[in-house]
Amino acid sequence: VPTINELRIETSYFRNLIDICDKNNTTLVIDCFPVMSCKLTSMLLSYHFLTLWPDIEITGVSGVTGKNDTITHYWLEVSNIVIDITGDQYNIINANELTKSIVMHRPFQPIHIEYRDCSYLHEIFRVNERETFIKGFPTITETFIESMKLDYTKLIGTVKYK
């Protein structure tokens, strides 16, 4: 299992690749990133993690908040560590579209990696779904795996060295 520092290093590297990539040339990284991008980019990040550490188990966490649970978010957890690479979307979205709790936590960093007990994610969002990702993504469709593989290759190709 990777350490929290290893996760921080790889997540920073990966978020940088997403920030600088040509979003017109990727299927899963959309041009309004990080807004409305949490699940797709978290899936790509899980692909990256499983490429580096094929024996780990990753949990994809879906959280909701707001009136009728209309505000959603998605992040990863490895063991007891939360990894969020799209929290900064809540700095961009208009405050009147968000809950007081989200606005009070501003500004959000582009990357949030913290032990679960120290993270604000479980304070702000109620977990409504968890899914497990392991090497090979047996619960994901082949088409989506191919999209991840293709975009991952493009992302990794944008920078030759860490």
Residue ranges and their predicted role:
Residues 1-162:
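A structural boundary/capping signal
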